[in-house]
């Protein structure tokens, strides 16, 4: 509601010590900072006794500066928000507190109250801009609300919901104004938030990350398709989503650091088949969180040294179960490369490339399952002799003849200037086809599933000049993705971790340039 009212969201609650009584921090349409303390009293009342119990938090809310450098020197408006009613005695106490602050020379420490009636009035005023009225989306939402919440987020169902509400379905583009698209982006955000109800109740942090990454990409896609300004129509919603993603990553990190043994789910023996794949995913996600914290600052409840130790100690658990795991391992490689240098680090690239072009004793390509197959699919395929071949989703799959990642991994290896190593691996590289799927348009690239596009298949020559490989590896031009996604490397990297088939060679080259400062060939080319 605040975003729809013209506020820019700066912070949304994680309930950590650094908040200083401020659950939500915004900058309103007049550039005035606002801080909100949220209290739940559904169907109830905030009594005088209840007010006294939260008095220390209210003091922090009104008197302590907002803990953000750009807002620290401007005093903020302070709001107590409750979804209940405030009793008369509590209202009188708040008025007396405000009067005392004014008498003492601190009129700026005034506490304002937003209670249930005010929230309902705001919702009524925003009307359809707050809540989607499309029956189909409500039906999809109800389907998602019955999910238990302890599994993976339902990408396919969410994709249908987002495409319908944001005008991203196949066929002619709806004739919507920018205001209508903006309204629908806000509505979609609310639907996503509601769809996470059961996942949040089970503290399923990965589901929350997945949902908000998918939403953010879809919001960018809507602006791209309707050719409207992202800054004016979707940035506020995406910024809020990014706050939620970062908070969920921090919560995931805290849980991973506190577990002993780390990352085990349920029975240790039964979990053994899934343990390393889960560990690899978490290492990739938390590697990206490390970059995020390095860029925006470390929260008080997550120590840099602890996270780095966890990431380094987990290296032995990296598991290349299929090409879908490569973006996860690349994220880890970028972290490792930033914190350590040397051939041992870049050797991880060689291991990945070697695995994608591996051959049998008869020089037949062996390779890995394509990025369209999940770990569950790969596991069912491996267990088909036990579970039955009718349960094998990959029964018709032929691996090894082509690779979605060999070309991009080769280019990253070329950037290390390992000429002799590339020469040695080239015979195996030249036996497979480089393949990628290019969606028809930039907005379709942002979707988790796209029906339209073309496959690009290239058979590498038996011999290739080193200078030609260098020229290819230097390119950091990315034409496939919209600029708002390219300009947010953290979001883009999370997007390809979730949807690895979007990690085309140009996307991998561009992301690697954003996260990896090492560059041992001539300067990059963005043209």
Positions of predicted regions on the chain:
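Charged, amphipathic alpha-helical stretches
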Residues: 1-4, 81-84, 519-527
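Extended amphipathic alpha-helical scaffold segments
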Residues: 153-366
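Alpha-helix boundary/N-cap detector
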Residues: 49-52, 56, 149-156, 240, ...
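Short acidic, S/G/P-rich loop/turn micro-motifs used as interaction or catalytic elements
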Residues: 41-45, 83-90, 336-339
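Long, low-complexity regulatory tails in eukaryotic proteins
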Residues: 295-527
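Acidic metal-coordinating catalytic centers involved in nucleic-acid phosphodiester chemistry
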Residues: 60-236
């Amino acid at each position: 509601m605040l975003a729809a009212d013209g506020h820019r969201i700066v912070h949304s609650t994680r309930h950590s010590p650094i908040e200083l009584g401020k659950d939500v921090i915004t900058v309103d349409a007049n550039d005035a900072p606002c801080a909100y303390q949220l209290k739940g009293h559904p169907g109830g009342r905030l009594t005088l006794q209840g007010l006294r119990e939260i008095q220390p938090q209210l003091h922090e809310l009104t008197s302590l500066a907002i803990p953000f450098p750009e807002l620290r020197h401007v005093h903020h408006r302070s709001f107590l928000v409750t979804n209940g009613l405030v009793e008369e005695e509590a209202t009188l106490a708040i008025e007396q507190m405000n009067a005392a602050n004014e008498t003492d020379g601190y009129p700026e420490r005034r506490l304002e109250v937003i209670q249930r009636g005010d929230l309902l009035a705001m919702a009524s005023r925003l009307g359809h801009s707050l809540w989607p009225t499309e029956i189909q989306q409500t039906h999809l939402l109800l389907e998602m609300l019955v999910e238990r919440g302890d599994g993976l987020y339902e990408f396919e169902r969410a994709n249908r919901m987002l495409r319908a509400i944001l005008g991203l379905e196949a066929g002619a583009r709806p004739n919507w104004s920018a205001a209508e698209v903006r309204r629908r982006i806000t509505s979609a955000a609310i639907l996503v938030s509601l769809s996470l109800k059961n996942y949040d109740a089970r503290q399923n942090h990965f589901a929350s990350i997945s949902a908000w990454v998918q939403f953010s990409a879809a919001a960018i896609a809507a602006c791209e398709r309707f050719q409207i300004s992202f800054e004016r129509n979707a940035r506020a919603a995406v910024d809020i989503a990014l706050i939620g993603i970062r908070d969920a990553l921090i919560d995931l990190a805290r849980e991973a650091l506190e577990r002993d043994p780390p990352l085990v789910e349920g029975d240790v023996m039964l979990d053994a088949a899934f343990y390393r794949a889960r560990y690899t995913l978490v290492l990739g996600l938390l590697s990206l969180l490390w970059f995020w914290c390095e860029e925006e600052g470390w929260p008080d409840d997550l120590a840099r040294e602890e996270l780095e130790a966890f990431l380094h100690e987990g290296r032995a658990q990296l598991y290349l179960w299929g090409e879908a795991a490569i973006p996860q391992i690349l994220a880890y490689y970028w972290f490792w490369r930033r914190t350590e240098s040397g051939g041992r680090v870049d050797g991880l690239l060689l291991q990945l490339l070697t695995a994608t072009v591996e051959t049998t004793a008869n020089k037949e390509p062996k390779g890995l399952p394509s990025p369209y197959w999940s770990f569950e699919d790969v596991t069912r395929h491996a267990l088909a002799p036990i579970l039955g071949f009718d349960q094998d989703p990959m029964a018709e799959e032929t691996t090894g003849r082509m690779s979605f990642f060999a070309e991009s991994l080769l280019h990253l290896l070329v950037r290390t200037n390992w000429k002799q190593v590339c020469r040695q691996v080239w015979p195996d590289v030249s036996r497979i086809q480089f393949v990628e799927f290019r969606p028809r348009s930039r907005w379709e690239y942002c979707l988790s599933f796209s029906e339209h596009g073309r496959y690009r298949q290239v058979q590498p020559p038996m011999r290739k000049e080193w200078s030609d490989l260098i020229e290819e590896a230097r390119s950091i031009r990315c034409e496939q993705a919209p600029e708002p996604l390219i300009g947010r490397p953290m979001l883009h990297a999370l997007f390809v971790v979730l949807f690895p088939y979007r990690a085309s060679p140009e996307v991998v080259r561009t992301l690697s340039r954003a996260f990896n400062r090492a560059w041992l060939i001539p300067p990059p080319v963005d043209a």
